[in-house]
Amino acid sequence: MNLLEKSDQEIIDIANPIWENLVKSSNIKDYGGFTKDFSSQMLYGANEVELGKQWANNKLLTSLSEKQEFLGCIRRAQFITVLYKQTSNTIPGEFLGRLVLGVEDGQVKVFGATIY
């Protein structure tokens, strides 16, 4: 699968369910659900204890709105970064969500996920 050749709409169709799952799983602190689409590289750095600390220390990560707005795609090397405008159910303001997708063993996987 050549992810880089896909249109923005095709990328959105792939990325949105992954992002929605990350938001839902983060809100309920579900480690298994949160990491289910992670690449092996991401899994290595996202152990359950570390994620638990992030969820405990950052209210934003457990209060994300299920509504987001797609902002665009950035294609670089073998990865596509998908950008979202994200809000929180409890924290005022708008946040930038970043989802880095790539292909591992023929499947689209998460190689990065952050929110600022």
Q: Predicted regions span which residues?
A:
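Short, low-complexity N-terminal intrinsically disordered segments enriched in polar/charged residues
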Residues: 1-28
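Cystatin/cathelin-like cysteine-protease inhibitor module
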Residues: 13, 109-114
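Surface-exposed, charged secondary-structure patches
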Residues: 53-103, 112-116
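Structural motif
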Residues: 105-107
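Short, well-ordered alpha-helical segments enriched in acidic and aromatic residues
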Residues: 27-41
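A solvent-exposed, acidic/Ser-Thr-rich amphipathic alpha-helical stretch
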Residues: 40-58
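Short amphipathic alpha-helical segments enriched in hydrophobics
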Residues: 26, 30, 59-62
